[in-house]
Amino acid sequence: RFTRFLKAVNAAGNGVEMNKFYLDQLSTHPDLTSPNVLDVLRELSEVATLAVVTNGFDRVQSRRVRESGILDFVEDVFVSEKMDSEKPNRKIFDAALRALGVENREHVLMVGDSLSSDVQGGVNAGLDTCWYNPNHAENPGKVVPTYEISSLEELYPLVMEPEELANVGLKNRRHQL
């Protein structure tokens, strides 16, 4: 892509080296975590199996996920490059659910910040979906999530039973940081 760009703007440079630099830099900026995400993941991982389904290059995404600190709380990470399919194609979700041993999709909630890939992908796979929309963006209405939240803490009542909600924040939980 950088070689084409350099040619299009009639500029000198090595597109292959630019692409390598871009991917290296991208993978060093996890930028996956919003405030409290690790706390929320810790709580949810006590009561549910969590996994990541992400589009991109395995080298980049695996490093980003690893450096974000979320690996302690997820069962697996499914990267589109390794899965030979990407969101919103249902095939990546089908493969991830198979790998996790999930048979009943009624017990699965796809949470994501992209209507076009995360939510549409979940819909395509027959899953309940939750659009994480912290900036209160307008939904153009083409993709309708099952739920919409603006803070990750809003996931607790969607995932947890009432008695589990009462334990949120207790220190005697399984995961400790």
PLM-predicted stretches and their roles:
Residues 1-22:
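A metal-dependent, Asp-based hydrolase signature
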Residues 5-9, 25-29, 80-81:
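Alpha-helix C-capping/helix-to-loop hinge sites
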Residues 8-9, 47, 99:
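Alpha-helical structural context
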Residues 16, 20-23, 44, 101, ...:
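Generic signal for short, ordered secondary-structure residues
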Residues 24-51:
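Short, acidic loop-to-helix structural element flanking the phosphoryl-transfer center
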Residues 38, 42, 51-177:
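Asp-based, Mg2+/Mn2+-dependent phosphohydrolase catalytic module
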